[in-house]
């Protein structure tokens, strides 16, 4: 029985073909630099369209003494339209995203775009978010099996959270 199953599986895998122009496995160097575990998978669905699925996970407390943390997980599906050919050159992107976070006692994040990031130094937030956005990017082909891409985008997110006073000891003071 096992011999037949092995032969069947080997024949299926030898008949199936895939090339670098049909799919890609990727990582985000920015997240890698912040010790966030991340992985992406992109697959071609038409001549100039791909779907990208990426995820990110950071389970680490940065400083256990002060309870400084930026813990999170999120998933981001994205559709991309390529102007020239898939996986190379200019592209437009539309994405959704959602996840969960536990962030507090972080005092190095600047205020930008109407956020309340400076509050992270005095409070801890635990919650969920969901959102959508658009982007523009470019992918440079470095070789037969290697690309590097850059993307800039804008989007919005809706978040609901519990707010805790004192980033370390944490008595709950409200919800949103």
Residue positions per predicted region:
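N-terminal secretory signal peptides that target proteins for export/translocation
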Residues: 1-2
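Short N-terminal segments immediately surrounding and downstream of signal-peptide cleavage
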Residues: 22-36
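Gram-negative (and chloroplast) outer-membrane scaffold detector with strong preference
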Residues: 43-150
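Bacterial N-terminal signal peptides
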Residues: 6-14
